[in-house]
Amino acid sequence: MCRFLIFKGKQPIRLSHLLTRPAHSIINQSFDSRLRLDRRRPMNGDGFGVAYYPLDTELSEDGPCLFKAITPAWNNQNLSTLAEKTKSDLVFAHVRASTYGVLSETNCHPFTYHSLCFMHNGGISNFKGIKRKLLNHIKDEYLNFIQGSTDSECAFALFLDTLDKLGYDPKKQDGDFGNVALRKAMLRTIDYIRDWTKEANKDEAHVEPSLLNFAVTDGSTVVVSRYITSKTDEAASLHFSCGSSFVETSPGEYRVERLDRNQDVIMVASEPLTFERGDWTAVPTNSILTIKKQTILLHPIIDEYYQEDPLYLRSSTLAESKGLMGSIPLAKAVEKNVPPLEREGRTRPPTAVAHIA
């Protein structure tokens, strides 16, 4: 499976502090992700992409800057150079291990449409069984927007069509749809996929659930889902961190500082960037996280797969069979010349403490 990272800051950050410099940066994760879902694929090496919103407001009117390549992220000199010379206060980054679709730049995330940016970690169950219904459902405008062959890009087209049918023009230039509109469109997109796959799989004895970790932004608000079409299984990993700053304490080692109650720095990631256990909190399974004006909101996704008992422990059997380890790095002494992924400790993530709206 893939990994993704979101940064939303009150002040801009150099992209290298997210993508290349941290010992457990998303690029190091692409080389050997310990939390990846499918251990039959040793690396997330099927391309990468990074989208960032320019600090110049005139340039940002047409949406984010986008850089993609099919080469492995850890072996792309252009990415390293770009990351050292670029700053942004809103960044989407993604490394891909393909589960559907061929290796091509058009299949690399993130995907953009005017001011909107979208990416996905996971997969749609029996996508071939619902693809025709999905494509027939959306307007030609969004059907023609699809360039690649992934389930993820089709999900984005469905999101755009859903946003349109809710009364919001996806071509809106100012990039401020508001958190309610984006969250509503995200939830309805999940509803469509859940219902269509359930119908397509009704005669199957056993099918794997859909893993729908979606992320979307309009350049202002960010909405992220952690969702699985199962009431008993765990979803793909997702964590968030917030604080007053994200600082490098020594080469490759970073920490989220909390000097006050402000959330000047917010990050959402498939896998944590730091080795400090207290830096990161697991996003609850089957919930939606919203970043609105540097404030985190968490909403449960209440449907047939919602667990009312907050103490209920979902089974890790499916996750373990796919290599999903519901854990985060622990801080410990760093030994020189030892790869970061070989010196980590692991533990279960702490309970979410963000505001539940």
From Swiss-Prot:
<dbReference type="GO" id="GO:0006751">
    <property type="term" value="P:glutathione catabolic process"/>
</dbReference>
<dbReference type="GO" id="GO:0008233">
    <property type="term" value="F:peptidase activity"/>
</dbReference>
<keyword id="KW-0808">Transferase</keyword>
<keyword id="KW-0963">Cytoplasm</keyword>
<dbReference type="GO" id="GO:0061672">
    <property type="term" value="C:glutathione hydrolase complex"/>
</dbReference>
<dbReference type="InterPro" id="IPR017932">
    <property type="entry name" value="GATase_2_dom"/>
</dbReference>
<dbReference type="InterPro" id="IPR029055">
    <property type="entry name" value="Ntn_hydrolases_N"/>
</dbReference>
<feature type="active site" description="For GATase activity">
    <location>
        <position position="2"/>
    </location>
</feature>
<keyword id="KW-0315">Glutamine amidotransferase</keyword>
<dbReference type="InterPro" id="IPR052373">
    <property type="entry name" value="Gamma-glu_amide_hydrolase"/>
</dbReference>
<feature type="domain" description="Glutamine amidotransferase type-2">
    <location>
        <begin position="2"/>
        <end position="260"/>
    </location>
</feature>
<protein>
    <recommendedName>
        <fullName>Probable glutamine amidotransferase DUG3</fullName>
    </recommendedName>
</protein>
<dbReference type="Pfam" id="PF13230">
    <property type="entry name" value="GATase_4"/>
</dbReference>
<dbReference type="GO" id="GO:0008242">
    <property type="term" value="F:omega peptidase activity"/>
</dbReference>
<comment type="similarity">
    <text>Belongs to the DUG3 family.</text>
</comment>
<comment type="function">
    <text>Component of the GSH degradosomal complex involved in the degradation of glutathione (GSH) and other peptides containing a gamma-glu-X bond.</text>
</comment>
<dbReference type="InterPro" id="IPR026869">
    <property type="entry name" value="EgtC-like"/>
</dbReference>
<dbReference type="GO" id="GO:0004044">
    <property type="term" value="F:amidophosphoribosyltransferase activity"/>
</dbReference>
<comment type="subunit">
    <text>Component of the GSH degradosomal complex composed of at least DUG1, DUG2 and DUG3.</text>
</comment>
<dbReference type="GO" id="GO:0005737">
    <property type="term" value="C:cytoplasm"/>
</dbReference>
